[in-house]
């Protein structure tokens, strides 16, 4: 076993390289800047490109262009930057452009505090696009998760032709720990699915029985079209209601139909439990300690750590909630993902504890909330 001492941001950079990333563009912003610095060291020696845009809008635009040309691309930012990314995120969704977007969250709103963490962007990542179509949001807990989930993020972006978010935060980004990268069983790398040379279809036309069209790279052997406007299979702008509805439903269904294939989680079940504790992100560290303390106090409790937030893994959550008398949700915000839990916990009381003051939620705070 060979241990590597790294933080979450380095885990993301290494995961990106292992997944085949060959293009990175970003604009410096705390606490995401070290991802850019890592990629600047890692990409050029392999023939990849790492560049700093003049601002966040340009940076994500560079990534979209690189991806449309056929290469795997990633960008990274924090709260103020993700707000500026919004229009281009919508373009990536509608244009079915594979892209990994890392949001190393910090305390908001607005500029907020660059050196304080939070999980305040969760709802923005889900709904911060015009049209409200579904997106994939993954939530690492530690540096190992950052490495593995980044690889999964690239695979999902390629497989489903969509932007994929990694919802990290300042504490995950800057916490250094020993990780056995060789022993953490990374997923098999998914390559881009280009349209075959004899493919007679259009740029946005899936093959028979499929929901995701093969990829027509810009500058490739086939004529390709791209637009941010509503379009039909040919890539031409359309105002035809039937064509628009068919396209929108396909964009929605391609993710919802595959959610069980990218549901990542840890579940610590106690026999005859009555309470389910639900957490995600760095708060999972405190929750693990709190669950140990609660069980020593005689509390029958299980712990669900969600590592894929959207599309909501409804089957998993409903199964975990089944036969519980109470659900407790803990978040580093004032209540964002708890709304999804409440929607699924029909007939089961849901309690919430949120904290957004720049400090980590402590195990003691969780114990106090559960036993109140």
Where are each of the predicted segments found?
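Amphipathic, non-transmembrane alpha-helical secondary structure
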Residues: 14, 86, 144-147, 151, ...
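Thiamine diphosphate
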Residues: 1-127, 134, 151, 170, ...
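Short, well-ordered loop/turn elements at secondary-structure boundaries
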Residues: 18, 70, 95-96, 132, ...
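Flexible loop/turn segments at secondary-structure boundaries
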Residues: 31-34, 60, 82-84, 108-111, ...
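Structural motif
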Residues: 74-76, 100-102, 137-139, 165-167, ...
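Conserved thiamine diphosphate
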Residues: 116-169, 194-196
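Flexible, low-complexity linker and terminal segments
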Residues: 2-9, 158-372
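N-terminal cationic-hydrophobic initiation segments that often serve targeting/anchoring roles
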Residues: 43, 67, 93, 126-129, ...
């Amino acid at each position: 076993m060979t241990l590597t001492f790294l933080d979450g941001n380095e885990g993301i950079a290494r995961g990106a390289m292992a997944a085949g990333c060959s293009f990175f563009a970003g604009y410096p912003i705390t606490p995401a800047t070290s991802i850019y610095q890592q990629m600047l060291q890692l990409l050029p020696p392999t023939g990849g490109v790492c560049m700093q845009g003049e601002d966040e809008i340009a940076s994500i635009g560079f990534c979209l262009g690189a991806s449309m040309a056929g290469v795997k691309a990633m960008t990274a930012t924090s709260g103020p930057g993700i707000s500026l990314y919004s229009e281009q995120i919508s373009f990536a969704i509608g244009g079915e452009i594979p892209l990994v977007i890392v949001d190393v969250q910090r305390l908001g709103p607005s500029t907020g505090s660059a050196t304080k963490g939070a999980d305040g962007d969760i709802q923005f990542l889900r709904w911060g696009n015009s049209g409200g179509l579904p997106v994939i949001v993954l939530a690492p807990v530690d540096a190992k998760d950052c490495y593995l989930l980044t690889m999964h993020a690239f695979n999902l972006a390629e497989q489903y032709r969509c932007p994929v978010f990694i919802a990290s935060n300042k504490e995950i980004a800057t916490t250094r720990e020993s990780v056995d990268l060789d022993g953490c069983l990374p997923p098999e790398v998914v390559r881009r699915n280009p349209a075959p040379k004899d493919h007679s279809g259009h740029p946005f036309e899936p093959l028979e029985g499929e929901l995701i069209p093969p990829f027509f790279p810009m500058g490739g052997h086939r004529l390709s079209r791209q637009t941010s406007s509503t379009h039909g299979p040919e890539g031409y702008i359309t105002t035809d209601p039937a064509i628009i509805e068919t396209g929108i439903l396909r964009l929605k269904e391609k993710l919802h139909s595959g959610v069980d294939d990218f549901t990542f989680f840890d579940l610590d079940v106690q026999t005859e439990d009555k309470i389910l504790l639900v957490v995600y992100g760095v708060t999972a560290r405190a929750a693990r300690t709190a669950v140990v303390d609660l069980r020593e106090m005689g509390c029958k409790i299980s712990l669900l750590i969600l590592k894929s937030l959207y599309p909501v893994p409804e089957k998993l959550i409903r199964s975990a909630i089944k036969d519980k008398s109470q659900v407790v949700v803990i978040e580093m915000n004032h209540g964002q993902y708890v709304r999804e839990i409440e929607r699924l916990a029909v007939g089961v009381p849901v309690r919430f504890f949120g904290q957004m003051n720049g400090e980590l939620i402590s195990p003691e705070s969780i114990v106090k909330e559960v036993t109140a």
